[in-house]
Swiss-Prot record:
A Pfam family matched in the record: Sugar_tr
Compartments in which it is found: Cell membrane
Reactions accelerated catalytically: myo-inositol(out) + H(+)(out) = myo-inositol(in) + H(+)(in)
Main location (coarse class): membrane
Segments passing through the bilayer: 1-21, 31-51, 61-81, 91-111, 194-214, 218-238, 245-265, 289-309, 324-344, 354-374
GO cellular component term, pick one: plasma membrane
Organism (species): Cryptococcus neoformans var. grubii serotype A (strain H99 / ATCC 208821 / CBS 10515 / FGSC 9487) (Filobasidiella neoformans var. grubii)
Membrane topology, from the record: Multi-pass membrane protein
PANTHER family cross-referenced by the UniProt entry: PROTON MYO-INOSITOL COTRANSPORTER (PTHR48020:SF12)
GO BP term, pick one: myo-inositol import across plasma membrane
Listed name of the protein: Myo-inositol transporter 3B
Superkingdom of source: Eukaryota
Induction section of the entry: Induced during sexual reproduction. Expressed during infection.
């Protein structure tokens, strides 16, 4: 329902802006559109987190994150195309109605979160949703997942019914596990903004115009397009490499890109006293070096912060998931506002090299936080990840929990193999056919090497 409400705000905001004939109307439209963006930014990743299978949850959230830079690429391309068209900006904003209306029409076909259904007491539908999320799982595995979710919802419901909203707010900051989890996702959101990436999007036209590009409006396609490509690569790797693994690999690339920008801007701006001058024609080689540094920086950003910050719901307990996601997203937009407002002033006072040096310092602090305080959630269910922060920041506990999860999965698989072998023996006995140890070993090896369900294999064997 919350996503549908966001769609309504998207639609109204886009219509108001596209039909604006006064600045106040445009401002009102932007505010309404911003409310829709803020709501969707919180709810969409949370919904995906609760309805996606554990094995591909990262990729599912990544798809959502991918469409952010993809939308930016489309918007930049359309903006460049209508730059010289009379009232072309109206068309640009009017097109924003299309995805919101489309989602309004199609959202009816999506399932509700099973945890929300359990919360409402609709356990039959919740079990059905779990079966649709895990279509190849056995009944025992579905029962296990349902039982874990049911116990967790019961515990969190008891907490919410016994306390008021403000009592829960106080409890969040007094309870170490809640405080650490919300701090983790909030710091990650802040780091994703304070590295300066979004300044490349907001001021790409201005920046690339200063660098001498003939069509500055197309400049936004360079960072946005690179970001979209590497978000796609990152989301395809996230469930294999892991969230923490991608951060440890991708952020150093981003840091090297910032160093590249510092050096590139230093030599580029030497003839103009270290500052960018709109009236000066810069050396094309140096311009190319700077653009290369920007692209290299965006490669690292696309692999990491661009989509991993939206995995925030994974790290939050159910009872603080909405509140924590709201806090983290608010931190994101506040940091975004601070960087956006100060960027051009920083270029004029600190020089471009100094500005990117400042972003480098903030990014190093963010990376240090990732190294020591950002645990891995790969292979863990949404009901298990919130346990990571019970005693500390969960980096070591994550390793132990994932090891235990693999052992549990192996026990389930061994139980299925044993059941299949028993059924095979019984079927052969009914046919009065003896089974040699060698034949049984061969059958078991076939089960282990086949990814299909044992029940299917038994049918074919008999």
């Amino acid at each position: 329902m919350a996503i549908l409400i966001s769609d309504v705000f998207f639609t109204i905001g886009a219509v108001l802006i596209a039909s604006s004939y006064s600045v106040p109307q445009m401002i009102v439209g932007r505010i309404i559109l911003g409310i829709g963006v803020g709501g969707a930014a919180v709810i969409a990743p949370l919904f995906i987190t609760e309805t996606a299978p554990t094995a591909v949850r990262g990729r599912c959230i990544g798809v959502n994150a991918f469409f952010i830079p993809f939308g930016q690429v489309v918007a930049d391309a359309i903006g460049a195309g209508v730059q010289n068209v009379h009232n072309g900006w109206r068309l640009l904003f009017a097109l924003g109605v299309v995805p919101s209306v489309l989602q309004l029409l199609l959202f009816h076909y999506l399932p509700e979160s099973p945890r929300i259904l359990i919360l409402k007491g609709d356990t039959d539908r919740a079990r059905t949703v779990f079966q649709s999320i895990y279509p190849t799982a056995t009944r025992d595995m579905i029962d296990y997942k349902f039982r874990v979710a049911q116990e967790y919802v019961a515990a969190t419901t008891a907490l919410q019914s016994e306390t008021t909203f403000w009592e829960r707010v106080k409890k969040v900051w007094k309870t170490g596990s809640y405080r650490r989890s919300i701090t983790t996702v909030s710091v990650l959101q802040a780091a994703g903004q304070l590295c300066g990436f979004n300044t490349l999007l907001y001021y790409a036209g201005t920046l690339f115009g200063l660098l001498g590009l003939s069509n500055p409006a197309l400049g936004g396609l360079i960072p946005a397009g690179t970001n979209a490509v590497f978000v796609l690569i990152g989301m395809s790797l996230v469930d294999k490499v892991g969230r923490r693994g991608l951060m440890l690999f991708g952020v150093p690339i981003m840091l090297l890109g910032l160093v590249w920008n510092i050096i590139g801007f230093y030599y580029l701006c030497k003839p103009t006293g270290g500052f960018l001058d709109t009236s000066y024609s810069y050396d094309t080689t140096n311009v190319g070096v700077v653009i290369g540094g920007i692209v290299f920086f965006v490669v690292g950003y696309g692999l990491t912060y661009s989509h991993l910050v939206w995995y925030q719901a994974e790290y939050l307990a159910l009872e603080v998931r909405s509140m924590g996601s709201g806090v983290a997203t608010t931190v994101c937009w506040i940091a975004n506002l601070v960087v956006s407002v100060s960027y051009l002033s920083e270029l004029e006072t600190m020089t471009p090299s100094g500005t990117y040096g400042f972003y480098l310092g903030l990014s190093v602090i963010g990376f240090a936080f990732v190294v020591f305080c950002f645990p891995e959630t790969k292979q863990l269910s949404i009901d298990e990840t919130s346990l990571l922060f019970e005693n500390d920041w969960g980096v070591k506990r994550s390793v132990q929990m994932r090891k235990e999860r693999r052992e549990t999965r192996k026990r389930f698989q061994d139980a299925e193999l044993a059941e299949a072998a028993t059924a095979h023996l019984e079927a052969r006995q009914q046919k009065s056919t003896s089974v040699s140890p060698a034949e049984l070993s061969k059958f078991m090896a076939g089960l282990k090497g086949n990814k299909r369900k044992p029940s299917v294999l038994v049918k074919t064997a008999t």
